[in-house]
Amino acid sequence: MSISLFSLAIDQTSSMFFYLSQFLSFLALPLTITISLIVLGAFFIQRKWGKRSLWAGIILLWFFSNPFIANQAMLAWEPQFKAFNEVGNHQIGIVLTGVTNLSKTAYDRTFFNKGADRITHALQLYREGKIKKILITGGQGLNPVNPQSEAELLQRFLVMTGVPAEDVMIEDQSKNTYENALFTKDFLEKKGIDVNQEFILITSAFHMKRSKACFDKVGLQTETFPTDYYSNDTKYDVPTLFFPDPYSIFIWHKLVKEWIGILVYKMVGYL
């Protein structure tokens, strides 16, 4: 009974932090700010501050939709990728989920989102002998549609590619990055695996700072292996420098949501 109550408390806390983070992210999103300024300015266009609001919104919309500026911001945030031959040999590579479409259910395949690099690069590390086993951490998230956890889906994918089932472990209860770290440590301890060894941490580059900090917080040593890059090599051409692109706003949304996530994690003591 006490275990059930504890689990319920954990779930409620996770939900609260998730919705708090989502709400703060919505308020701080570039599109929210720019549209608010433009709409406010349009309604009060006859007033001096209304015109300023309108122009501020238009200028910010151009700023956030500029491909060059968005790419430079993401380049500055994402850590540099590592060559496979620069990675040391480890027993276990830890893969964070968040790369499949859990809103579409199928039992004979995995629907990947952009972040598929997380699992495909983990597979490459395994094939090249850099890791001996793969531990996938991640459950269904909040408000799941698919009854299968992401960890299960990715485990099945790896087995289909020829990885022996005994070399793929899953932790399928975590709902956020902090729980990824916390539940992974608990899983390893229950399996009798040395938690003092160094692991390879595999996740998207934009998400690596928060992920690494969470694993540090719970006492797991990791070598990072960033994947799934949103930034590109710098280009100086007319479309990149001057033409607005909706994808650039998406890049800023990823950055702002990650920054808000880090802020919330610090507020609640996860980092």
Where are these regions (language model features)?
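Short, surface-exposed patches at the edges or C-terminal ends of soluble domains, predominantly
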Residues: Y229, F242, P246-Y247, I260, ...
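Structural signal for the C-terminal ends of transmembrane alpha-helices
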Residues: L40-W49, S65
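Membrane-embedded alpha-helical segments of integral membrane proteins
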Residues: F6, I10-F43
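Hydrophobic alpha-helical segments of integral membrane proteins
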Residues: M16-L24, I69, A73-W77, W252, ...
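A structural signal for short, hydrophobic/glycine-enriched beta-strand patches
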Residues: F63-D245, W252
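Alpha-helical transmembrane segments
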Residues: F23, P30, W49-A56
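Hydrophobic membrane-insertion alpha-helices, especially the h-region
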Residues: S53-P67
